[in-house]
Amino acid sequence: MIPRIIHQTWRNEKSTPASYKLCIESVKKQNPSYSYRFYSDEECRSIVKEDFREFIPAYDSMSPVEKADLFRYLIVYRDGGVYLDIDCYCVANFDRLICDAEFVAGYEQGWKERALFRYTQWAFAARAGHPVLIEAANRCKANHLQGPTTWTLKKTGPIMWTYLINEMEN
C-alpha cells in the first residue's frame, strides 16, 4: 500500500517562485491527511549520501535535472508515497488515484508522436521498496556512466522511465 506522503523538491525554499508556492498550497489543501515533505538540493544530496552511498559518485557528477530525477526515484523507494513536480497544481485528493495500489504512474494519452515520453515521472506513487524505483535509480547511474553525450531525457528522465515501465509490464 502506498503511504500518505507527498515528496517535492526545489533548489531551496527561499528561491521557490510564487507560482510554485501556489501549486504547493494546492497539493496540501487537496491532501490534508498526507504528510508533506519538501527537500532542498542540499537535503537531497545529504539523503543520497546517508542512505544511498553507492549512488554518490554518479549523483555528484550529474546535472541538476539529472540529480532531481535520481533523487525522486530514491526517496520514494526509501519511504514510499507520492512524488509530484513542484509546478503541478492539484485539483483533487490523491486517495482516488492510489487506492490499494503498489505503484501508479501517470500516462499521457494523445502523445503518439512522443510515445517515448508516455509515462510521466513528474507525478507517480509507489509503496516503499517497489522494484521499479530501484531499477530506475540503477539505470540512472548506469546511463550516467555512458557519458555526457546521452540525452538527459533518455539517461534519467521520461524516456528511460517509459522504457523501464514497458519492460516491467511485459
Where are these regions (language model features)?
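Glycosyltransferase-associated regions of secretory-pathway enzymes
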Residues: 1-68, 84-170
